[in-house]
Amino acid sequence: MTLRSLYRDTALACAVLSAITFLPVAARAAEPAATAPKIGGATPMEWSIRMARSEMDRRGDRMFFKEGGRARWEYTHGLFSYALVTLGVASGQADILDYGERLASTFITADGEIETYRVPSRKFDKIEEYNIDLIPPGRTILHLYRKTGDERYIKSIALLKDQLDKQPRTSDGGFWHKQRYPYQMWLDGLYMGSPFLAEYGQIFGKPEALEDVVHQIKLMDKHSYNAAKGLHYHAWDEKRAQDWADKQTGLSPNFWSRSIGWYGMALVDCLDYIPATQEDGEFVVSILRRVADGIVRYQDPKTGLWWQVTDQGDRQGNYLEATASSMFVYILAKGINQGYLPRDTYLPALQRGYEGIIRDFIREDGKGRIDLTQCCEVAGLGYTNSKGMKRDGSFEYYISEPIISNDLKGVGPFLFAGIEVEKLLAGLSRPAPLRVTGWESYPAVLARIKAPEFPARDFAITDYGAKADGQTDATEAIRQAIAACHAAGGGRVVVPKGTFLTGAIHLLSNVNLHVSEGATLLFDAEPSRMAKNYPVVFTRWEGVECMNFSPLIYAWEQENIAVTGKGTLDGGASNENWWGWNNKAAGRPTRQVPDRDKLFAQGEQGVPVKERVYGPGHYLRPNFIQPYRSRNILIEGVTILRSPMWIINPVLCQNVTVRGLSIVTHGTNNDGCDPESCQDVLIEDTLFDTGDDCIAIKSGRNNDGRRVGVASENIIVRNCTMKDGHGGVVLGSEISGGVRNVFIENCVMDSPELDRGLRFKNNAVRGGVLENVFMRNVKIGRVGEAVLTIDLLYEEGAKGSHKPIVRNVQIENVTSTASPRVMFIAGFEGAVVDNIRFKDCTFEGVEAAEVVSGAGSISFENVTIKPARKPRSANSVPAPAN
């Protein structure tokens, strides 16, 4: 699949999926800290924050534009600005974010023109230089546009895009580095232009821009890679006319580490916008792996650092250089974190590299600030340098340029590196992306999901003072048992036979909360004790992040955790407490509604999460079990009753197994299992008898979901019984991050109260791409509405600007005995419903005509409908053009 066909129907939707990825999330400062180890006395994030503030102090306001000042719109300025913005978002440090934004925003005039670059109203325009080094500050402008929607920024972005549209090119389409460097492609230039162009293409729905980015990357690899060395040369001259260019190949004579760093950073950053599981993305990943292999191959074994001239080691005059070393660490760390590079292969080099940077390059300056030393100030090709020396690409030239401290070409990558190393060492990396085409991909998805195992150590809660009388508060005893188990390296925290009253339980890594047969954990729902029992934590509520009552069982950034056993979890909810907050009897607004409306408005407005505080005095009910930003999770065997709200709701988790449960709870909004922005999830052998959807796969609501921008993917549902609920398996409606790769098999769904078997619910306010959903061998008895429902007019319907997309859905060997309709599909102009396939199915007891509007291709193969009706393929809107 090409990028053009991939983005053909998703132009706006994909734009929105990441359009607010870097909005300021000041609430991150309020979150529990990740567990990255300290290196040289500080965590990687702390080193980045300290370096950022050191530079902010050193440079003051000199880099902000002002009349008569010396600040200029150029690439080092843009690199530093974007690094600060990224760090400000990741760390929640508002001062860093603000400084980074102002480095770009102060250049933008009221009319959207760019001071010192393009001010057409004053007849000042540098476009004729066609200098690709002038594009990088545009990345911060893209961020500001996503954050504010200010029309000035659209105009500024258009000026930058106009340059790229007119940029001179080589005969095969590669951007010239500058007008004064004709027919030349430099590794540096890939970072200067491509990340901006890729992000632009995604935000504004321009697949041709993304295709151009891939083309630039491929050309640079084709022309500059030396397979024997495993490295890319600094530059290539198509005409072989430059003094530095080899007359046969057009290549420069040496491998300069920083130029390789620019290229590698372009690869990992552009992959944020090019799907790594599509053909073009896979090719870019293959290039990244070659770059990474070269980085590892030429790492200095003594220090873990890298040399100015990459392959020349300790040749006289060569030196270990900080800007390239920082770039290389960033490339490896982000590549691992995003799943592009195998962790075990590259982690040792990355760790030694980062430790070497801190040990050998970071120095105190005597004023409480730190310096990044050993930075090559500048290097290029062609013309002469400030010393009158020819920039001929020779070894002697590269080692002759000045060595300084705190060059922004090193500071920026150092900030990026700290963010990614922090994430990596805190265990927040993603698994490798998986390309899914159909059921043939099922074994690969299943192989990624493995339940955690625990040491054979037991910690009985009764040993810590818990009493099985159903009246004495066991919360502290359970907390102590969990802490002891965790400190010992893991095991089981055992709840023995009897009833134990408790408040919120917070799990820690390597702890299995085991509820024995005959045991009940009764969660205290007495309103007067809710503030004490369920302290405010960072959570999601109906797809929007906030600070709210703790879920009954909660984990934050933990791994290898479980809730198991044959006992019972009783949430204690009733109309006298939790459920009463959303009791819709008598047609009156519920107490929950004002808080719900306020939270949703805060999410739309981008209010920092730490300011979205609910809990005591408010009426947003907690979910029952919510591991958050955790991995390797098992929930098995227990019976769950009387949940306040959603029952099982892992958020931003990876490798989750839900197995063998009996879920019987009929309160309002009692969804059974709602994986949200999760990867690699198995739900099997479970009974769902619920007051809302049995399973509802989610990925965040509206702008807040798009800000986080993480899809739910690689989800298997098998051997489950959906006895009661609104929908059997549902995608939505909090779905703005998207859903893909869902497999459903061998399930039974049968209840007059169960409205739909498979349901998609979305609208133009949520947006999101829902794709690759496969259902087979499912027996459906009676359902109230249809076997398949695709409702894109849910709630707000078409009244929004974020196109919902549903595509590549296959229903195979599915039977029903009493469904009014086979399908109910409600789309609208601009939305996409396409490639819906029924195969080898029998639907009996069908009473009403199918409802299909706003759909593309719907096909039937070997399908029987009784009473006898002829199935037919349906296209109510034309199929998308190729």
Where are these regions (language model features)?
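Bacterial N-terminal signal peptides
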Residues: 11-24
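Extracellular "leader-to-stem" segments immediately downstream of a signal peptide or signal-anchor
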Residues: 28, 430-629, 634-637, 645, ...
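CBM-like carbohydrate-recognition segments
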Residues: 35-78, 90, 97, 106-132, ...
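Extended ligand-binding groove/face enriched in aromatic
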Residues: 98, 108-245, 251-252, 382-384
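Extended ligand-binding clefts on enzyme/binding-domain cores
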Residues: 187-188, 194-311, 315-329, 341-393
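Short glycine/acidic-rich loop motifs that flank beta-strands on beta-rich extracellular proteins
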Residues: 490, 504-505, 524-526, 549, ...
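Right-handed parallel beta-helix
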Residues: 517-518, 559-567, 631-641, 654-665, ...
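Extracellular beta-rich repeat passengers
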Residues: 735, 753-882
